[in-house]
């Protein structure tokens, strides 16, 4: 019989007391549950004497936003913990350390990041992070290269593919991102004022073809171990530091899905900026920074990935002239396509982003949603034609100009 049960704050304290070498025997531990996501309990445990602190995260057997009618396997906690360990091994400065775990309790204990800010919150507050593109480019290059056939023994990689089969959470992605926004679904969640946009998504067969091709790649391409949910709510930042958390959606899939997720969330904040920034000059500066950062995410990833390829690939066929360029061209196209799907999903499907949802002015919020959808659709429609990440700037600025001009006529 399983010992699993949702922990109380007292039980969380008792568990972390037994982690070797962290809290002293004289520690006076206090605990509060701070989880604000849909899938987990998160306990913040602090020693009031030393101020040392730790995080304990426990998976729930259902989706909190829906309830017990949407059950989930607790094995995702094991997947998240192993993904964190894998990522920390490859990028120790960019991923919190796992300090303890209990797979039966679906519990992982890790380094506390209270000194950092959730990136989504920081962006909403108007902060910029000049080192972010460098850091996340490094994270993406190392985690994707060294878990792919390019960077590890191919047979060992196949064993990892087995360990990270994650059907339930992949199904969430397949439904919420790559299916339901393009048809009627009870999971869709949007304001009636953009029903025209939702109807356009349901009837655009050209768009559907591109989404179908991206969905096929998501479901069939085991290129590398992905984080699987790499949005700005899964990234903690300071001006000097970046930490990636929450890889419970981890699985083997197409590299562009992770890179596209980061870019998509920067573009969602771009669309939301009129709700958070006053004045044309300040708005332009903030949007320019967000767009340039999105471009730099790819450029930093690509530069590091090429270096890792040149230094570490042992398969002689992977060194064939032209292969590296073609490989990365396809990853770029996937990145843009998946970024577009991610943007669309955050407006139409379940679970939106605070960047847009918490805008107080309803007219500004609607304009942000319409701009996000225009950007998302443009990215999906052009993904197979893209040859340079710098084209992203033209696509986004064109969509912005068209939406702004259209809004001024109303």
Give a label for each model feature.
Residues 50-53, 58-169:
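Conserved ATP-binding subdomain of kinase catalytic cores across diverse folds
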Residues 32-49, 54-55, 211-257:
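Active-site acidic catalytic loop and adjacent metal/ATP-binding pocket
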């Amino acid at each position: 019989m399983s010992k699993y049960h949702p922990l109380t704050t007292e039980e969380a304290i008792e568990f972390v007391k037994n982690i070797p070498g962290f809290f002293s025997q004289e520690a006076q531990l206090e605990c509060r549950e701070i989880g604000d996501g849909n899938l987990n309990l998160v306990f913040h445990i602090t020693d009031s004497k030393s101020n040392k602190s730790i995080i304990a995260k426990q998976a729930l057997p259902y989706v909190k936003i829906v309830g017990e009618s949407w059950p989930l396997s607790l094995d995702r906690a094991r997947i998240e913990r192993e993904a964190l360990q894998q990522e920390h091994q490859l990028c120790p400065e960019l991923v919190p350390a796992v300090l303890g775990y209990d797979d039966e309790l679906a519990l992982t204990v890790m380094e506390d990041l209270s000194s950092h800010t959730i990136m989504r919150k920081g962006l909403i507050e108007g902060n910029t992070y000049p080192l972010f593109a460098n850091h996340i480019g490094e994270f993406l290059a190392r985690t994707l290269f060294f878990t792919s056939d390019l960077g590890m023994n191919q047979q060992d990689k196949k064993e990892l593919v087995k360990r990270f089969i994650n059907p339930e959470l992949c199904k969430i992605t397949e439904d919420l991102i790559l299916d339901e926004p393009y048809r009627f679904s009870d999971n869709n969640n949007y304001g009636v004022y953009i029903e025209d946009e939702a109807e356009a998504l349901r009837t655009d067969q050209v768009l559907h073809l591109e989404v179908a091709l991206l969905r096929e790649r998501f479901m069939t391409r085991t290129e590398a171990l992905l984080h699987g949910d790499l949005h700005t709510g899964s990234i903690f930042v300071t001006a000097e530091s970046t930490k990636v958390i929450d890889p419970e959606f981890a699985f083997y899939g197409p590299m562009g899905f992770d890179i596209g997720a980061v870019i998509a969330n920067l573009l969602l904040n771009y669309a939301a900026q009129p709700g958070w920034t006053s004045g044309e000059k300040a708005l332009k500066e903030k949007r320019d920074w967000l767009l340039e950062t999105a471009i730099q995410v790819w450029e930093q990833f690509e530069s590091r990935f090429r270096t890792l390829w040149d230094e570490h690939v042992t398969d002689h066929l992977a060194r064939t002239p032209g292969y590296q360029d073609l490989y990365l061209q396809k990853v770029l196209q996937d990145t843009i396509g998946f970024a577009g799907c991610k943007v669309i999903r955050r407006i139409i499907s379940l679970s939106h982003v605070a960047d847009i949802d918490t805008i107080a002015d309803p007219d500004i919020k609607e304009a942000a949603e319409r701009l996000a959808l225009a950007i998302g659709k443009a990215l999906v429609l052009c993904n197979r034609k893209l040859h340079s990440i710098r084209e992203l700037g033209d696509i986004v600025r064109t969509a912005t100009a068209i939406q702004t001009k259209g809004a001024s006529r109303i």
